Amino acid sequence: TPVNKIFVQDYRKKYGRYPTFYAAQSYDTIMLIDSAVRAVNGNLRDKDGMRTAMRRAAFPSVRGPFKYGNNHFPIQNFYLRKVVKDSEGNYTTNVVKTVYTNHQDTYAKDCKMSW
């Protein structure tokens, strides 16, 4: 995604290496929180508004389109990746193919949670 490309470029510039998946998840987390705070105009006492905004997940994810399933797990794509060396000799991964598109957790259908 374009957001992912910018994230990787900025991360490499600052840290001199490719970001880990944990770094991407952390970035998404803070972007989700930021989108919720903006949705309530900074009024953190508006807990219902914060919850609604967090559920909506209207933020630019580095993983592409992002939404939650009924069990509060992300619905997202999964990829088969191959470790390769880039033009500078650094190890990175390339996407070989999309394994699952908009995949929801296998047990979501059994989950009794609801919004």
Predicted segments, located by residue:
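Extracytosolic ligand-binding ectodomains
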Residues: T1-W115
